[in-house]
Structures are given as structure tokens and as C-alpha cells.
Amino acid sequence: MQITWLGHSCVLLSGTKKVLVDPFIEGGSVIDTDPDIVAVTHGHEDHMGETVALGKKTVAINEIAKYLKTKGIPAEGMNIGGTINLDGVTFTMTPALHSAWIEEAGIGCNGGAAAGFVIGMDGVKVYHAGDTALFSDMKLVGELYHPDVALLPIGGRFTMGISEAMMAANFVGAKMVIPIHYNTWEKIRVDPAPFKEAIERTTDMKVKILQPGESVEIMPSA
């Protein structure tokens, strides 16, 4: 599997299928990624992004799925703790501690709960934590699903920051950690280097700091 960080929380997983998570990038477009499946962690506009414009099969919590269906999107609703298989790709929805309002025309509507995903494809499991605070049940993500890669927000203010993300990485126990949701705007500007240094100095985990548009190849676990 190839993992491409497009910026903010937007990640493209490429293998047998192309899965685009949280299709938003600041000042740009993700339309040309042409994914097979879109996954949305919660209703905020910096995560819903171009979901409607893409018009693809979309996985989201039930409330968002119902909203997307009113826009003509072939959405697959699910809920936290559930797993679905779409075209050979598995999506397990995990908890996240965050708000989840769907922002539309300055009014908005109920977006259910914020969530994360463990996505399985081609023998690789990727945990996208979504926007979240640190919580102890992240340990269960590691114990139940054994992800190979953890995508963790580190920007602070609206999510956990570096120190909490370090603890989250230890809870999840993935072999590789990729920081997300940082440096998009000044309010979430952080240097990811100390995060990488501390984790690699104290654990066997590797931290891959990607630039927007940069990719990393992940091989299936033996």
C-alpha cells in the first residue's frame, strides 16, 4: 500500500483500491485524486471538504451518510465499533473525542459523533485517528486491530498536541506513525521534529514526517 499525505488530515491510500480520507486541503483541490472510496471522519468543513464534489462512494457515521444522500452521494452509513467491507477494503469505525457539527450555509446540522477509522487493504491496516483528544481506549485500537500505521493529529488547540500524541502512539503501538493535522494554519503550527525524535529515541516505532504530496510505501506484516 502507498500512503500519500496531501496535507492537513487528508490522506490517500493506494493499493487494490484508492481510498481518500477527509478530502480537504487548504487552498487546493483533491478532485484529481479520483478515489474509488471516500472516508469522512466527521462533519467539520476541513474534513468533509470536497466530499460532495467528488461524488464517490463514501463511508461515514450514519448521520453524515444520511446528509450526504440528500446531496446525491452514494454514502455507506455505519457507527462506532462497526466494520464494513467495500470492494475488498475494510473500514472499522473507532471513537474520537471531538465535536462533529456539519457546517453548511452558516447554519449547520447534526453530524453525529466524531470518529476515526482502521482501514484494511492489501494486508495492511492503517489507523486514521481523525480529530481527537487523547483517550485511554486508544489502547484497544492497538489490542483489537493491530494497525501497521497510525495517523495521529499533533497540532494542538483543536486536537491533541505533541505530548499527548506521543502517548497515543504508545497506546496504539503501530510500527510507523505519521503526524497529521498540523501546520495548516498558524493556530496549529508545530514543529514535528521533536515528536519524531522522542518516539524513535524511546520506542521501536518509526515516525515518518511527510511533506504535502509525499508518499511512503507500506508492506504487509509478515
What are these regions (language model features)?
Residues 34-35, 52-55, 73-74, 106-107, ...:
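Short, glycine/charged-enriched secondary-structure capping and boundary segments
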Residues 1-33, 77-143, 212-222:
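Core dinuclear metal-dependent hydrolase active-site scaffold
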Residues 25-76, 144-151:
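Active-site metal-binding motif and surrounding structural segment of the metallo-beta-lactamase
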Residues 27-28, 44-49, 65-68, 82-85, ...:
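Active-site environment of divalent metal-dependent phosphoester hydrolases
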Residues 115-175, 180-189:
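Metallo-beta-lactamase
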Residues 4, 69-83, 166, 170-222:
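Binuclear metal-ion centers of metallo-dependent hydrolases, dominated by the metallo-beta-lactamase
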